């Protein structure tokens, strides 16, 4: 899914398991707990870092199971969500106030969380995947999809699908092959990351629990 000549790095099932074990460790701080939740969502959705770090609650559609990221003149990018990703977002919702704009608010000020880089350096060392970049989580999503028999057009659709910016134009995606494919891929990754989909818990490691 990337142009020829670009660096490719995917996490193996064993590496995903190690990553999951590190993410499940008790959080040393609220920052590390937030970073762990963001990393889970990145690998379970194939979304770009900025799409999750800067996610607003108004962009999360629990009814149709998708993220609807506003862009510019192109309308909106729709990211279908599997059950594991939806559960993480639902858990996260329990930890944020009803008037909070951001899914992952900053500890100070009115912006969103932006401390992922520092935390990722620590997490990947502990998981023994020191050469893995945050963007490689997106590559991993695509690789798992291909290995699960999901067609490349569907994977490409999940990673970069765009729709016009009205509810009527995107709501029908809830029952399309894109949503089904996202769930297949997410379930495969969750099985490796958590041991089973039942183990998914977005905030069980938070220091302020």
Residue ranges of model-derived segments:
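Basic, Lys/Arg- and aromatic-enriched nucleic-acid-binding interface segment
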Residues: 1-49, 53-54, 63, 73-75, ...
């Amino acid at each position: 899914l990337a142009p020829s000549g670009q660096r490719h790095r995917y996490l193996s099932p064993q590496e995903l398991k190690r990553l999951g074990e590190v993410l499940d460790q008790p959080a040393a701080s609220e920052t590390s707990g937030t970073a762990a939740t963001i990393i889970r969502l990145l690998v379970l959705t194939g979304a770009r870092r900025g799409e999750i770090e800067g996610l607003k609650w108004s962009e999360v559609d629990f009814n149709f199971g998708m993220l609807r990221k506003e862009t510019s003149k192109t309308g909106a990018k729709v990211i279908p969500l599997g059950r594991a990703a939806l559960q993480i977002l639902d858990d996260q919702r329990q930890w944020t106030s009803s008037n909070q704009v951001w899914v992952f608010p900053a500890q100070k000020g009115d912006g969103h969380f932006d401390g992922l880089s520092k935390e990722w350096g620590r997490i990947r060392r502990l998981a023994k995947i020191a050469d893995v970049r945050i963007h490689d989580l997106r590559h991993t999503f695509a690789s798992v999809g291909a290995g699960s028999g999901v067609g490349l057009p569907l994977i490409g659709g999940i990673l970069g699908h765009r729709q016009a910016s009205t509810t009527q134009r995107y709501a029908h995606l809830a029952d399309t092959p894109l949503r089904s494919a996202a769930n297949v891929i997410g379930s495969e990754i969750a099985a490796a990351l958590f041991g089973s989909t039942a183990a998914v818990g977005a905030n069980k490691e938070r220091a302020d629990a």
